[in-house]
């Protein structure tokens, strides 16, 4: 879960933390060049986000992807639609730690209990619960449904347009 975890999987057993960090730095360098060309948005996501934005809803991103990758994806696919966006940094721990979600809520001037967090992994949902937010599991993501359910979603939805029911 996250690019650093991917780097750990890419090195042989017994690799040092320094070697893992080197692989991670190389990955981040290549991501800007190649990663975005291999990335696409989920069908219907842009239209849904534009509708939420038009309704005046505050929108944020909190991802386990490294911060630069988050900013790149946001700029390419969703420019001007999000009020805040963050990824993993030295000061923002990976989910399921709730700190990143709480930071986003603070930056948008929102109480966590009035926020819904939409996630496609069980760690997303655990983070939402840990932050005191509504945990909405999205079934169109990368994790199998049974694994997603281990995060105890408050609600499951099946398509980006279903997000509009929360607005």
Residue positions per predicted region:
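Asp-based, Mg2+/Mn2+-dependent phosphohydrolase catalytic module
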Residues: 18, 51-57, 66-167
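N-terminal helical cap/lid subdomain that shapes the substrate entry/recognition surface
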Residues: 1-47, 51-55, 68-71
């Amino acid at each position: 879960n996250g690019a650093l975890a991917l780097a750990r999987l890419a090195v042989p057993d017994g690799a040092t933390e320094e070697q893992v960090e080197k692989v991670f730095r190389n990955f981040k360098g290549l991501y800007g060049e190649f990663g975005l060309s291999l990335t696409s948005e989920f069908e219907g996501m842009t239209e849904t986000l534009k509708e939420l934005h038009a309704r005046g809803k505050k929108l944020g991103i909190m991802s386990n992807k490294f911060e630069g990758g988050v900013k790149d994806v946001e700029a390419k696919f969703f420019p001007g639609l999000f009020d805040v966006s963050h990824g993993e940094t030295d000061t923002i721990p990976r989910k399921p730690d709730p700190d990143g979600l709480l930071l986003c809520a603070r930056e948008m001037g929102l109480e966590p209990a009035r926020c819904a967090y939409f996630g496609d992994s069980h760690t997303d949902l655990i983070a939402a619960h840990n932050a005191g937010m509504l945990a909405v599991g999205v079934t169109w993501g990368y994790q199998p449904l049974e694994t997603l359910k281990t995060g105890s979603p408050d609600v499951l939805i099946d398509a980006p347009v279903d997000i509009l029911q929360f607005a």
